[in-house]
Structures are given as C-alpha cells and as structure tokens.
C-alpha cells in the first residue's frame, strides 16, 4: 500500500513538472515574441538581484579598503604612554626587546613595531608646512606605504643610525613645491629650536586627508636623539592581530594588555592600549551606518523583485484560465495545479537570477578592472568605487533570493482555486 502511494506521488510530481515544462515552452513565446508577463517577471528579478550584488560588493569593498588603509598605517592596536592621552606631549614608554618577544610569541599577534613621533615644521625657501614626523625602526612593515608610493622609495630606517631621508605625502610635496631628491628643513620647538635637514626619498598618497596632510616618516634613531631618549624609549608600539579565530582583535588586545601590565609594574609607567576602532571611532561608526543603508536597499530590491514576479505569475494564471479549467476537468486538484504554476514561476525566477548574476558580476569585474566610476578621495578616502566579490555571500544571496521569491508566490497562487472549470472552458 505504501509502495502504491509512493508511485502515485511520483506520478503526480512527474505530471506537475511535465505540465509546467509544457507551459514554460509554449508560453515563453508567441507570434509577437516573448510574453510581456514573462519579460516583466524576469527583468524584475534580474535587475533586483543585480542591484543587490552591486550594493553588497561596493559596500564590502568600501569597508574593506578603508579599514585596510587605517590598519595599514597604524596596525590594529596602538600602545602609548597613558599621560599622552591626558594632554602631556612627547612622553615615552619603555619598550624592551623581551616585551616585543613576548608579544610576538603570544600566538594572537603576528607583528609588532616601535615608533616615535614629534610635531614640527617642514620648510623651504618659499613656504612651510606643519607636520608630525614619525620615526620607525628596521622592523617597520612598509608594505602599505609602498603600495601608496607615487614616486621614489621608502627610507631605510634603523635604530642605530640617522638616514637623513624622509618620506612625505603628495599634499606636502605640492605645498612645499619639492620632489624626490630635494632637500627640506625640519624645525622642532623645544627649549631651543632644533633643525634637521632631510632628503625627500619618496612621495606617497593614501587619499586619507588626515594622514596625507600630517604624517612624514623617517628613522626612529633621529626622533630618539631629538627627544633626548634612550634607545629603549619610544612613543609607542603598534601591534597587528593574528586572523586565526572569531575575535582576533580582542585576543590580541588581551595579549598586549598582559605584557604591558607586567611592564608597568617593572618601570612604573602607565600604558594606554587602544584598538584601531577606538582611535577612529567616528570613521567606523560611519561605516556601520553604511551597513544599515545596505539592509534597507536589499529589502527594497527584494520587494521590487517580489512584486514583479507576483504580477507576472498572476498575469500568467489569468492568461491560462482555460488551461486551468481543463486540468481541473481532467481531475487535477487545486494543490497539484498550484504546484505546477509554482514550478513554472520558479523557472522564470531562476532564469531572471541567471541574468541578474551575469549583469551584477560583470559590472563589478568591469569596475575592478577599469575603475570607470571615480570618487572624490577628499570625501570618500578612495579615488574610485571599490567592488569586492566573494563566492560565499554571492551563493548565499542567490539562495535567499530564490527561497523568498518562491515563498512570496505561494499566496498569489491561491487564485487558481477560484477558477471554475465550467466557466473557464466556456469562456475560452
């Protein structure tokens, strides 16, 4: 009896798929071309999905590139003297080699680098510009700065000898009217004005106005001598978190806190440990607002796609009233006919999704390759619209779109139950 029931179910499923296939094949084209209902439904799904792909790709690309620039310049965590945050300038912290070794051995940290900083003036014979000179050691990761280089090279920085070279931004170079190889004077205000001459080794541009108008980079040895510090005294330490679990930044923060708390007991200094998000709270709050906007756009596009596919299904049902009547007269149940039209609509949705994927992914790849849509870096930190495609969210978006589209069709398909065979066949 169970086998007989299963055979019946299989036959009904085969019947529904067969009828849906016939309707799809015969209803897809008429003498005048493709049916408007099918075109409307497919276009709505395609355009909705394409816009959703573009929205996610642009937003994720924007967040990723902006975050990379922030962390590329100052890493994930910064450790400085606590009193600096209270308004006391140029107070060093002690950074012994064992502290760096302990951080690097924690497993939650992949890189550490010391830095020293001092505010001053860069000047030429005709003009001057305020700046913050950042001194770095031989362990400094220049990969981000090298990716932002417009010309020249990064200076060779050590903690044992002055390089006499400086890396400045394009904004500074334009103001000072200097280029690679030119010499500039740097003046620093202390009890007496102290000056240093530097050769411009390279010019960078991050498109972050906060960085480009302020920071120049040289060796840490020069800064330690200017400040009168010992070799183990620095402005702070920058730490890069290991991306090895769900919350790598928090684990790296805890590791840094443990090391520097122990150092505070030994040296009597107070250390302030801050993450990139804390240092750039306004920027990351703005990025979070973008996520809210993305959610609203996705809901809107899903609603538009759902509206068009529902409209298309209802039009197809009304056009196929006589077919529904004939199927009912032959003994087909309302649920069976509803499944038939849902299968038909699902095929239309899949066809529209295929077209939407092609359009959305193609536009993203074109923008990645040719950067056709520019941005004002003064306002958006980037010079072109970023697009970041990842397979996992692309697959997830397609699955959610298909499931929600089919679920939205269940209600409108109930119109089939109102079709009376006698009236619909006579009407035809």
Where do the language-model regions lie?
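Transmembrane alpha-helical interface segments in multi-pass membrane proteins
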Residues: 314-316, 323-368
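Short cytosolic juxtamembrane segments of multi-pass membrane proteins
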Residues: 414-428
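Hydrophobic alpha-helical transmembrane segments of multi-pass inner-membrane transport and secretion
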Residues: 33-62, 288-323, 346-355, 403-409
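N-terminal Sec/SRP start-transfer signal
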Residues: 2-49, 428
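Mechanotransmission and gating elements of multispan inner-membrane complexes involved in transport
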Residues: 189-294
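Hydrophobic secondary-structure segments that place a key small or acidic residue at a functional site
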Residues: 116, 131-136, 153-222
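Short helix-loop junctions at transmembrane helix boundaries
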Residues: 351-397, 410, 414, 418
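Hydrophobic, regular-secondary-structure patches
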Residues: 50-132, 157-160
């Amino acid at each position: 009896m169970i086998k007989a029931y299963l055979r019946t179910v299989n036959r009904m499923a085969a019947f529904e798929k067969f009828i849906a296939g016939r309707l799809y094949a015969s209803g897809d084209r008429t003498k005048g071309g493709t049916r408007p209902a099918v075109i409307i439904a497919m276009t709505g799904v395609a355009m909705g999905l394409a816009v959703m792909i573009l929205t996610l790709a642009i937003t994720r690309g924007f967040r990723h590139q902006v975050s990379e620039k922030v962390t590329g310049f100052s890493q994930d965590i910064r450790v400085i003297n606590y009193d600096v945050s209270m308004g006391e300038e140029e107070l060093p912290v002690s950074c012994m080699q064992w502290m760096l070794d302990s951080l690097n051995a924690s497993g939650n940290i992949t890189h550490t680098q010391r830095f020293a900083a001092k505010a001053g003036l860069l000047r030429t014979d005709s003009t001057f510009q305020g700046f913050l000179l950042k001194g770095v050691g031989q362990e400094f990761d220049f990969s981000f700065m090298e990716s932002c280089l417009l010309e020249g090279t990064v200076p060779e920085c050590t903690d044992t000898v002055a390089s006499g070279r400086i890396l400045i931004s394009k904004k500074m170079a334009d103001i000072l009217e200097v280029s690679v190889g030119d010499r500039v004077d740097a003046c620093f205000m202390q009890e007496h004005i102290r000056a240093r001459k530097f050769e411009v080794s390279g010019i960078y541009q991050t498109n972050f106005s906060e960085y480009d108008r302020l920071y120049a980079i040289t060796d840490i040895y020069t800064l330690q001598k200017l400040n009168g510090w010992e070799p183990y005294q620095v402005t702070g330490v920058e730490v890069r978190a290991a991306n090895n679990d769900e919350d790598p930044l928090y684990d790296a923060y805890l590791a840094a806190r443990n090391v520097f708390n122990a150092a505070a007991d030994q040296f009597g200094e107070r250390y302030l440990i801050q993450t990139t998000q804390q240092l750039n709270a306004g920027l990351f709050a703005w990025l979070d607002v973008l996520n809210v906007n993305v959610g609203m756009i996705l809901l809107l596009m899903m609603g538009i796609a759902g509206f068009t596919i529902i409209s298309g299904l209802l039009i197809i049902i009304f056009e196929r009233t006589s077919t529904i009547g004939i199927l009912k007269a032959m003994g087909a149940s309302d649920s069976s006919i509803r499944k038939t039209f849902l299968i038909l609509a699902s095929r239309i949705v899949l066809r529209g999704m295929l077209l939407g994927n092609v359009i959305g992914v193609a536009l993203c790849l074109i923008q990645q390759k040719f950067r056709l849509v520019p941005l004002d870096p003064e306002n958006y930190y980037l010079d072109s619209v970023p697009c970041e495609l990842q397979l996992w969210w692309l697959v997830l978006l397609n699955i959610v779109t298909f499931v929600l589209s089919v679920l939205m069709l269940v209600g409108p398909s109930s119109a089939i139950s109102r079709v009376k065979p006698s009236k619909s066949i006579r009407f035809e």
